[in-house]
């Protein structure tokens, strides 16, 4: 029904956000398909699953039936990503193939999330940003993200009418307020820092649903994003 692109500078926690947001949407009794054109199947590593060629983004782009190519992670949670065994990114597809796949996914699932590459020259990510109803732009991360924002000023301006800034505060002690001032943005929703995040990911545990004060704060931020993309 709707397409949401998740974008931002490298190392801003885009994929972690995408995985946990998709999981949260599925917990709300809505079907969600998380699509990632990222090479070497980063998603399969985070989720702890092996994505075969026949259940991959490559197969879907070549015209294989979508219902047979998506990989089921959990009830109502599906993934369409690069195959785990891929040794190099598959770039042998056209813009029309991407548009067709995105529209088919829109008609098939309640929510489609696309974990976009930071690079603006990636064809799949470019079309996902173009066709998206909403763009979640991860701001924060590392200081180097300021340079990325400056280098991609035109692309950011093109999507500004449908962009919601998400504060990705992944480094403890960093003055993110000063960074947001440099970026001239005010994140509407901030994702709190969770020190144990790498450990939980290694254990194949979602950050959404963690107990404790930080877990509740994280869930609160994710739930707000769910409202944004599902209403």
Regions of interest found by a model, annotated:
Residues 2-39:
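Walker A/P-loop phosphate-binding motif and the immediately C-terminal alpha-helix
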Residues 29, 74, 109, 132-133, ...:
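Short, well-ordered alpha-helix to beta-strand connector turns
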Residues 33-107, 199-202:
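P-loop/Walker-type NTP enzyme "switch/lid" segment
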Residues 169-171, 177-211, 222:
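Beta-strand-loop-alpha "switch" segments that mediate conformational coupling across diverse proteins
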Residues 108-119:
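Glycine-rich phosphate-binding loop used to anchor ATP phosphates in small-molecule kinases
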Residues 6-7, 35, 81-82, 113-115, ...:
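Conserved beta-strand segments of the P-loop GTPase G domain that flank and frequently precede/overlap
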Residues 122-142:
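Inter-motif core of Ras-like GTPase G domains
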Residues 92-99, 150-173, 209-212:
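P-loop/Walker A phosphate-binding loop and immediately adjacent motor/lid segment at beta-alpha junctions
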């Amino acid at each position: 029904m709707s397409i949401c692109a998740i974008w931002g500078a490298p190392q801003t926690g885009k994929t972690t956000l995408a995985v946990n947001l998709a999981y949260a949407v599925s917990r709300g009794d809505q079907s969600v398909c998380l699509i990632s054109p990222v090479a070497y199947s980063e998603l399969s590593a985070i989720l702890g699953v092996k994505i075969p060629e026949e259940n991959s983004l490559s197969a879907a782009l070549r015209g294989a039936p979508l219902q047979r190519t998506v990989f089921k992670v959990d009830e109502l949670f599906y993934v369409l990503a690069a195959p785990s065994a891929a040794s190099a990114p598959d770039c042998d597809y056209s813009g029309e193939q991407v548009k067709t796949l995105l529209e088919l996914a829109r008609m098939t699932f309640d929510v489609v999330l696309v974990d976009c590459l930071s690079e603006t020259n990636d064809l799949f990510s470019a079309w996902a940003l173009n066709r998206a109803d909403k763009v979640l732009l991860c701001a924060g991360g590392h200081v180097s993200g300021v340079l990325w924002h400056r280098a991609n000023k035109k692309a950011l301006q093109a999507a500004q009418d449908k962009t919601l800034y998400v504060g990705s505060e992944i480094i403890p002690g960093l003055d993110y307020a000063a960074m947001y001032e440099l970026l001239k943005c005010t994140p509407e929703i901030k994702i709190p820092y969770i020190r144990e995040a790498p450990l939980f990911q290694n254990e194949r545990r979602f950050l959404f649903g963690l107990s404790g004060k930080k877990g509740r704060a994280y869930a609160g931020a994710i739930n707000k994003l769910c409202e944004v993309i599902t209403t």
